[in-house]
Every structure is written in structure tokens, then in C-alpha cells.
Amino acid sequence: MTERVRVAITGGSGRMGRTLIEAAKQNGIILLGAAIERAGSTLMGVDAGELAGVGSMNVAITDSLDKAVNDFDVLIDFTSPEASVFHTDWCAKNGKAIVIGTTGFNHAQKEQISAYADQIPIVMAPNMAVGVNLMWKLLEVTAEVMGHYCDIEIIEGHHRYKKDAPSGTALKMGEVIAETLGRDLEKCAVYGREGMTGERDRETIGFATVRAGDIVGEHTALFADIGERLEITHKASSRMTFANGAMRAATWLVEQDAGLYDMQQVLGLKA
């Protein structure tokens, strides 16, 4: 690829938004074309680079995708489920690709976004860290070999401000394991335990959630049998790992046809 990829970033003033701006600044292929913030923000007109602490980038924070329509090729969206659906609708109407890192979607919202994939290329992934996507491949192999003979638990931890639980990454871990074992996660998932729960059902997949301090993201899948257990863990120490993954997704996405993709495809881990 010889031409730079122009991106717009929504939620530009948030923790993840600022990290995405910093990642764009550091990336030799990416060019920041626009940074979007909600209407009424006191940061309108502030230089996005200055806001992110990386120096001037000559891109002012704006509240309008319409005004920036000619300034970018790919929208990178880590906001909220409602906002992401709105932004995907806008991209479909304006012929823009979109990378979605938002989590917490309900089934109907996922279906809405999937429908737009007939018109535009979309990467939608609950976690864009390379290590996490490799972990999902490891979970497939582990579930095939051990899953039918083990108790399976998924434990995740995030900072105190995270809104959804379990995390999208944890749910994806459960989906990967359940699909490999031929189970329906909606029927076999157990979200927390309390009181006299009785003996554990081996067919279930348990989830436990921690929300504390400034934990960036920690996920563990535990496969426990009598006499041994295997733990597969990923720990993120910086949001930059997610931001760099989003930049990688954007550079890949501009060369794709309309469709719904995930980070496994971006990284070449599946067709």
C-alpha cells in the first residue's frame, strides 16, 4: 500500500479516543482526517493531537460527520452500542468503511450492523489486540482436546468505569469454546453464582467479572479437571494495544469489498 489511509475517530475526547488519536499519529500509513465528539462538548475546535498529548495534528475536534465527509475513508468507532449503530448507518449512506470496537451490543443491534455489511466493508470485533485473537485460536484447540472432560470458567477484569459485563471479549471466549464443543452459549452460560448452587454441571460455562481500579483488561479461560487444570490468560497493560489493532484493521479494510469481517480475518487467522 502506497497511499495513506485517512481515518476519522469518534469519541475523540474519551480515554480510548485519545489513545486512537495517538496511535494514528504514530502510524506511518494512517492519516487522521477527522476527530468527532458529541454535540455540545466544550472541546469543539481543539486540536485533536493537542488533546491527545502528541502535539498539533491540524485536525480540530468537530461534532459533525457530515462536515468531515470528504476528509476520511474509514471511521474508527469505540463509543456505545447506540452510537455505533447510528455511525454505521451514516457510513452506509455515505459509502464509508467502518471499524467497530464497541462492546455491549444486544442481538437486535448486531443484526442492524450486519445488515449494513451488504453495502459497506465493516470490521467488528470485541477486542482488537493481536494477543487476544491468538488466544481465541488457542481456545479452539484446547476445547477440542480437553473441553468435554473439564469444568470451564471464564474470568475477566476491567477498570471501574466499564459499563458492560461480562466484557465482549469474555463473551467471545465463551462463544468460541461453546461452538467448538457443539453447545449453545445462551443455554449453557452461568453468570455468577450465589447461595446453595449445588454440584457444578460440567456442561455449563461459568463467567466471573471483576470491576476495579484502572485494570485495562484481563481475561482467563480455566479448564479444570480432577488433578490438573490449564489456564489461558491475556493481560493488557495499555489501551494502545487495542488502538494499534484498530489501525491495522483500517489499513486492511480499505482494500476489502462490502462485508462483515472480524480481527481473525484481518490477521489472516481465518479466511
UniProtKB/Swiss-Prot annotation:
It comes from the Bacteria. GO terms for molecular function: 4-hydroxy-tetrahydrodipicolinate reductase; NAD binding; NADP binding; oxidoreductase activity, acting on CH or CH2 groups, NAD or NADP as acceptor. GO terms for cellular component: cytosol. The gene is dapB. NCBIfam families: dapB (TIGR00036). The active site is at residues 158, 162. It comes from Shewanella halifaxensis (strain HAW-EB4). NADP(+) binds at residue 38. It holds the Pfam family DapB_C. Keywords: Amino-acid biosynthesis, Cytoplasm, Diaminopimelate biosynthesis, Lysine biosynthesis, NAD, NADP, Oxidoreductase. This is 4-hydroxy-tetrahydrodipicolinate reductase.
